[in-house]
């Protein structure tokens, strides 16, 4: 896709590309330039598809983190940083001007709450490490976003 989305059908294509993870920066740029008439029916379908894409990316990011082979400190840090980058990207996705302030705030809060939940879960699971090293790494390389 090489032009900014203007109608719902264009946005559906954009959301599919977003889900695939292909060329994130280019698709984000198109999303920022895109527009849509915010009216009943279209708005609900638009938000539904956007939330599906965002949830898909959130789930994929956490799955990739869990599947990564973290055998040493550097790999753990790299995995945490990759997870944070993905969360930051998803936050940029919902921060586009096409989305009204109320809906944008709700979406942003959903993603921020998810990042907080992931961080809490990581810290809780690190408590079983008797050396405290894993806990220190997780606390010093937080995945939480603002």
Indicate residue ranges for each PLM-predicted region.
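Long, low-complexity or tandemly repetitive, helically biased scaffold regions used
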Residues: 19-144
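N-terminal leader/targeting peptides and immediately adjacent processing regions
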Residues: 1-30
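Short intrinsically disordered terminal tails
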Residues: 1, 145-146
């Amino acid at each position: 896709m090489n032009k900014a989305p203007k109608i719902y059908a264009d946005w559906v294509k954009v959301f599919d590309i977003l889900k695939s993870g292909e060329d994130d920066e280019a698709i984000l740029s198109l999303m920022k330039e895109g527009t849509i008439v915010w009216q009943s029916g279209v708005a609900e379908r638009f938000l539904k598809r956007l939330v599906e894409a965002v949830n898909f990316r959130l789930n994929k990011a956490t799955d990739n983190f869990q599947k990564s082979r973290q055998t040493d400190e550097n790999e753990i840090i790299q995995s945490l940083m990759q997870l944070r980058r993905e969360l930051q990207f998803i936050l940029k996705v919902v921060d586009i001007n096409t989305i009204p302030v109320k809906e944008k705030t709700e979406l942003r809060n959903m993603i921020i709450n998810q990042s907080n939940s992931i961080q809490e879960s990581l810290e809780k699971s690190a408590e079983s490490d008797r050396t405290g090293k894993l806990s220190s790494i997780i606390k010093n390389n937080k995945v939480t976003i603002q």
